[in-house]
Amino acid sequence: LFAENALIKAETICKASGLPTIADDSGLCVDALDGAPGVYSARYCGHHGDDEANNEKLLAAMQAVPAGQRGAKFVSAVCFILPDGRHLTCMGECPGSIAFTRLCGDYGFGYDPLFIPADCGVGKTDKRPNTENRSYAQLTPDEKDAISHRGNALAELEKQLPSFLGE
């Protein structure tokens, strides 16, 4: 559904503006909750945009879930559309797990204080950060950008766009 939602958003803006458009749809998918909150991430608590209530509801839903079963991933679909209707949608993910409590930091929004990205490790040619069991909210913007679902989706779009455009 993320891809479908991204396409709907892109089509709407492209039709209104007459210009090529990029739109995304993203969310958090928790294994123990059968993928919820998923496409309803922004309104998981029942209304749109209440990060604190969404976090509280997620923590309550995960209260009895043991450490080894708290897998989750952020998912992003990015859609590029041309005024003629041709479009390209690319997906990105960041795997991780849900913390037992908020791991607040100086950055982030939404579920960032609850999401611990999988350790990316650090190698000589690897520019991704070692996440060291830090939440998204505890990573600097540059660290988060290097591993994020949106960053991964945009990198894939950048890779596929030239052939899509016939360049």
Language-model-detected regions and their locations in the chain:
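Anionic-ligand binding patches
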Residues: L1-E167
